[in-house]
Amino acid sequence: MASPFFFVFLLSALSLENTYASPNYREALSKSLLFFQGQRSGRLPSDQQLSWRSSSGLSDGSSAHVDLTGGYYDAGDNVKFNFPMAFTTTMLSWSSLEYGKKMGPELQNSRVAIRWATDYLLKCARATPGKLYVGVGDPNGDHKCWERPEDMDTPRTVYSVSPSNPGSDVAAETAAALAASSMVFRKVDPKYSRLLLATAKKVMQFAIQYRGAYSNSLSSSVCPFYCSYSGYKDELLWGAAWLHRATNDPYYTNFIKSLGGGDQPDIFSWDNKYAGAYVLLSRRAVLNKDNNFELYKQAAENFMCKILPNSPSSSTKYTKGGLMYKLPQSNLQYVTSITFLLTTYAKYMKSTKQTFNCGNSLIVPNALINLSKRQVDYVLGVNPMKMSYMVGFSSNFPKRIHHRGSSLPSRAVRSNSLGCNGGFQSFRTQNPNPNILTGAIVGGPNQNDEYPDQRDDYTRSEPATYINAAFVGPLAYFAASRSP
């Protein structure tokens, strides 16, 4: 008879056997990818579906005599920050690699979203030898204005890192994005895939050879917006892990070993990549029985134990409504990223029929899946507010999101420029945004499950590319496994 102190972790409160109807995950998946069209910078194609957006940033890079058009605006502003953009690209690519077979026609839409970013990241990496461009736009000037990206007249300052002003973090994240995406395109566009991988190797070598945090090199241009708070070791591990998966080159195995263990976080985000790297590297230990990566398998499981609510080592708070609550500012970014890791590690466990322990609790794959599903469902409307935090999904969703293009009249409605200050009248109104940024996931409710839906409350009402990117994988998983 089993010890009374040893029990199977069932997460009964979060069981899949629930009393509510599951959301339409397939619809949410489609809309989560459509969102990226609303964030596009550059010349828009003829098949642009969010028609209220127009081409913008067509001279980006000109101040440095290079072409840096394209890519994505990170959130509700008109700045291109490559650090979170590259993470967005890596997570979209990981979603496609792990769940592509479950995505149906959305796999091609995912590739389109990825390529919009990688075309730009390639420009940033290849435009000037010995230099990596890492952003366009003056965030301090941009944030003082409320204007459409099509009209922006704030400085389009170009930022870069180099051997004398290093940025191992942003370089390694860029390498991760290029390496991960190279696998996405390996069969459908081999030539493009080879270019991505070759560039990833060069950028990763740059990150390794010239050590330093980009926050120190660029200071107020990236801080406090996207400071590298966790340092750059996590990105070196993350980047090397992706190069290893893309190449299987022993060089990256040895480099990963040289880095040793890392922090034991209870978070995963555009800044802190440790948990993501652990899960990615654990894949080799779980699926291939590769002892070189057993350390990271243990680290991945320690991370899961910090997330599961009834685990003895849990350090994660949950709202009364069941939502993970990590930090007040844009909490859903952590929810979607962690949910991706839960779903993906459970996938690895299921394929090999593995379990692990959190103290005396035996963790089975469905414990992770049940928690993942609860988070996905909460975001999609199964919550105390009965509100979907994905714009345009269901009838009750955020109507006043903190997003310049969405909140201002489109060019079709008002062709003349509003100027830097002309848009603040729209910013201050209680009217719903005139343009629906379909699929955007906002920062989310507070710790009391409350969401005021106020445009000036950017910590809760601002969407961001990295919130959506991590959500694509879990949506694809549940869309494919949902019972009719």
UniProtKB/Swiss-Prot annotation:
Top-level taxon of origin: Eukaryota
Miscellaneous field: The sloughing of root-cap cells from the root tip is a process of cell-cell separation that entails cell wall break down. It is important in plant development because it assists the growing root in penetrating the soil.
Family: Belongs to the glycosyl hydrolase 9 (cellulase E) family.
Keywords annotated in UniProt: Carbohydrate metabolism, Cell wall biogenesis/degradation, Cellulose degradation, Glycoprotein, Glycosidase, Hydrolase, Polysaccharide degradation, Secreted, Signal
Expressing tissues: Specifically expressed in root cap cells.
Principal cellular location given in the protein's record: secreted
Gene3D superfamilies in UniProt: 1.50.10.10
Pfam family, one: Glyco_hydro_9
Active-site feature positions: 77 (nucleophile), 402, 453, 462
UniProt gene name: CEL5
Record InterPro entries: 6-hairpin_glycosidase_sf, 6hp_glycosidase-like_sf, Glyco_hydro_9, Glyco_hydro_9_Asp/Glu_AS, Glyco_hydro_9_His_AS
E.C. number(s) listed in UniProt: 3.2.1.4
Identification of the protein by name: Endoglucanase 3
Positions annotated as glycosylated: 370
Reaction equation(s) it catalyzes: Endohydrolysis of (1->4)-beta-D-glucosidic linkages in cellulose, lichenin and cereal beta-D-glucans
Signal peptide extent: 1-21
Induction (record text): Down-regulated by auxin (IAA) and abscisic acid (ABA).
One GO process term, biological-process aspect: cellulose catabolic process
Record localization: Secreted
Species in which this protein is naturally found: Arabidopsis thaliana (Mouse-ear cress)
